[in-house]
Amino acid sequence: FAVRRRAKHLAQRLENVNSASDPLCALDWINAWAFAVGEENACGGRVVTSPTNGAAGVIPAVLRYYRTFIQGASPEGIREFLLTAGAIGLLYKSNASISGAEVGCQAKWVLLARWPPVRWLQFWAHPRQVENAAEIGMEHCLGLTCDPVAGQVQIPCIERNAVAAVKAVNAARLALAGDGSHFVSLDAVMQTMFETGKDMQSKYRETSRGGLAVNIVEC
């Protein structure tokens, strides 16, 4: 059972696209970069766990987006991005879970909670906006099952990296568009994620005994 690689062909096509004439070109590049990491992991290549191998495409895709499309991107912004994303990941690891086998695939996308880099949109994000971005990212992943087809980290995992990376950028932009005030706190969504995962049947928690894993014909 194998999935055809798509990242290289997508990147080659995008190299011939005038990004100024296509406002969604940046999203296509995010998809390509996330695909590349997901595909490398699926074929047994070397990737950096963040927070799992199956979700390792999100951070590099968003970082590459920052370096490529954000005016004034800097090494300082990258460091702050990684430090803050790591800190939020530790909050989830300490107070909930980052394990798909424990609480489903929602746990793997905790780093949708990310710091808008320092020069993103030309101003500093307030800590409340950082927390808001983290909350938005997880709130809309609640209940996400982990049901890999054939037990391989390919379907839906590779595409899910791309979807999550785009969602991470959007969560940051939504948070930056506000003043940081919001009804749902990060603590509340973290607790909800953990409780939701514990309520999931085991067939939806990385066992490949339910969901897509049993409804896709492997031939």
Please describe what each predicted stretch is:
Residues 32, 36, 57-67, 83-91, ...:
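Contiguous, well-ordered alpha-helical segments that form the cores/surfaces of helical PPI scaffolds
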Residues 95-105, 129-133, 144:
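A beta-strand-loop signature enriched in Asp, Gly, Thr, and Trp
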Residues 9, 47, 53-56, 98, ...:
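A generic structural micro-environment signature
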Residues 120-219:
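Functionally critical mobile loop/hinge segments
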Residues 1-104, 211-219:
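Accessory "access/gating" subregions that flank catalytic or transport cores
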Residues 23, 27-34, 52-55, 59, ...:
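Generic structural signal for well-ordered, non-membrane alpha-helical segments
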Residues 12-20, 66-70, 93-97, 112-119, ...:
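Short, charged low-complexity intrinsically disordered segments located at boundaries
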